[in-house]
């Protein structure tokens, strides 16, 4: 069905097509949806039905949680959400590079605020594994950034299976500086301290996950993993989008500012994943994302060290059948 809809959707502005597709999910007939039977994965104290989940960014406010759940994901990650709602960057801010199965976005953490997301999650019927991705508001300076993350962490704790700290988006000014040295260590120290309090308050432990950039040096990644191990962070998502344009040079829209995702990100993000595996071994769960649009690319992520996978851009180009193709293919291995 998606193969019939895609040419029509691709005639629309990318952000309008994105919104329309999410709306249409609510009206698809029941036979279109399926439950995937895969190989369970035990990670971060959770049992994932299979390896393929949805990356953050598709449903920022949790408005489409039940509809997305019917596509067969093992887990769904919502967000990025910030303490206060914000409009994000001016439009247009989402661009397809169809020739390369790629997307450039400079959305800028547009969302309705953490309170709206929590209410949407509470009203949904979804009972599966739920990640919630948290960030800081644009106007919050770096010295106060930890306050934004702590605020969101407290708000979402009782509604999340795990919480992702997004400090790697290229579309919020200076955000990636939070991956550096003292900023990073102080942020994780405060979140770990709060995690202990919240676990006692709610009677359950919710793992923290860090989403990293593919554009950092090997040395920076090593420093980050040392801090991640020091503070008992249980997962790393590798990776966010890249600022590099080497893989799409001279293609339409390639000069647009923002983060590049999709097939051209595959090699860079997988290299990062492989390095992270060397640095953390089996002490931290690695979630591979970036360029997965086939069974082959999914296998490459797993071979590089990923225990779990997330898709987003591949879903835009291949449709929900991508989930089935990967899960059934991995089952056959």
UniProtKB/Swiss-Prot annotation:
Membrane topology: Peripheral membrane protein
Reactions accelerated catalytically: (S)-dihydroorotate + a quinone = orotate + a quinol
Any one GO biological process: 'de novo' UMP biosynthetic process
Requisite cofactors: FMN
Record keywords, A-Z: Cell membrane, Flavoprotein, FMN, Membrane, Oxidoreductase, Pyrimidine biosynthesis
InterPro entries xrefs: Aldolase_TIM, DHO_dehydrogenase, Dihydroorotate_DH_1_2, Dihydroorotate_DH_2, Dihydroorotate_DH_cat, Dihydroorotate_DH_CS
Residues binding FMN: 56-60, 80, 133, 166, 211, 239, 262, 291, 312-313
Signal peptide stretch: none
Family membership: Belongs to the dihydroorotate dehydrogenase family. Type 2 subfamily.
Quaternary structure, from the entry: Monomer.
Name the UniProt record assigns to this protein: Dihydroorotate dehydrogenase (quinone)
Organism name: Legionella pneumophila (strain Lens)
């Amino acid at each position: 069905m998606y193969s019939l809809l895609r040419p029509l959707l691709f005639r629309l502005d990318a952000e309008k097509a994105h919104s329309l597709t999410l709306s249409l999910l609510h009206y698809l007939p029941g036979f279109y949806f399926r439950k995937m039977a895969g190989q369970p994965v035990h990670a971060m104290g959770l049992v994932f039905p299979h390896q393929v989940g949805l990356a953050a960014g598709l449903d920022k406010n949790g408005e489409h949680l039940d509809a997305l759940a019917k596509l067969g994901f093992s887990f769904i990650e919502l967000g990025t959400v910030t303490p206060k709602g914000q409009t994000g960057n001016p439009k247009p801010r989402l661009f397809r590079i169809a020739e390369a199965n790629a997307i450039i976005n400079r959305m800028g953490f547009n969302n309705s605020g953490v309170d709206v997301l929590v209410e949407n999650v509470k009203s949904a019927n979804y009972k599966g594994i739920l990640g919630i991705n948290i960030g800081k508001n644009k106007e919050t300076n770096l010295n106060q950034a930890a306050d934004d993350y702590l605020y969101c962490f407290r708000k979402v704790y009782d509604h999340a299976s795990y919480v992702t700290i997004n400090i790697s988006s290229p579309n919020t000014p200076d955000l990636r500086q939070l991956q550096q040295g003292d900023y990073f260590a102080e942020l994780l120290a405060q979140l770990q301290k709060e995690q202990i309090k919240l676990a006692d308050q709610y009677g359950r432990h919710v793992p923290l996950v860090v989403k990293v950039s593919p554009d950092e040096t090997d040395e920076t990644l090593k420093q980050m993993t040392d801090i991640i191990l020091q503070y008992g962070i249980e997962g790393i998502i590798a990776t966010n989008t890249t600022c590099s344009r080497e893989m799409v040079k001279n293609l339409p829209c390639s000069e647009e500012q923002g983060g590049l995702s999709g097939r051209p990100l595959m090699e860079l993000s997988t290299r990062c994943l492989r390095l992270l595996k060397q640095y953390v071994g089996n002490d931290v769960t690695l979630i591979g994302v970036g360029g997965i649009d086939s069974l082959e690319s999914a296998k490459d992520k797993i071979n590089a060290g990923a225990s779990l996978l997330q898709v987003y851009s591949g879903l835009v180009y291949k449709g929900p059948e991508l989930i089935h193709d990967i899960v059934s293919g991995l089952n056959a291995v």
